[in-house]
Structure formats: C-alpha cells, structure tokens
Amino acid sequence: MSEAFFVLLKVHLYFPESGSLKAKRSELNAVKAHLRQRMGASVAEVAHQDSWQRSTLAVALAGRSASSCLQAADAVRRMLDARFPQGVRVDGRLASWDDLDAVG
C-alpha cells in the first residue's frame, strides 16, 4: 500500500469584472495566497497570463491517504465556488507514489 498520495487540480477561473491585467493579478494573487497559506497547496498560474479575464492554475496537494487528499481537494473546490460564483471549473486527478512507479 502506498505511503504517499497527491491530487493535481487544473483550475479554470473567469474574472468578468476585471478590466485590466493589474486588477486580475490582484485578485489572483489573493486566491493563490489563500490556497498556499490556508490549504497548504502548491500553486502556479499555467495559462492565460496575458489575458485580463481568464486564468488557469495548477494546484497540488499531498497527503498520507487518498481520503485526506480528496477531502483537501473538495475544500479547494468549495472555496473556489464560493469566491467565484460566476463560474470556476476544476478538473482533478488523484494518484499515489505507486502509480508513479508503475509509469516509470
């Protein structure tokens, strides 16, 4: 049985009220800080850096069990749904260290 699990989330955000890159980055930096500081996630903006109304984030969470990782991912989804009522899409994958070993 694996001793390490992780969840990778691809988060698609929409900022309809943002009128500039500066406004988007201000809101996005607050979201990234919350994910890092309150939820212990690793976060990177991976697409749409030059778009003022869209952003795509990669979010990674690690834990000792699959259930703890899934609970953490669920908490991230709930936080994002509350913060972005106009719409957010989150795609996720759960894997274990053993899964990585099997890939090579």
Regions from the PLM with identified roles:
Residues 9-13, 57-59, 90-94:
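A structural signal for short, well-ordered beta-strand segments
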Residues 4-8, 52-54, 87:
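A general secondary-structure signal for short beta-strands and their flanking turns/coil
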Residues 23, 27, 51-53, 61, ...:
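Generic, well-ordered alpha-helical segments
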Residues 65-104:
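C-terminal structural segments of small proteins and small subunits
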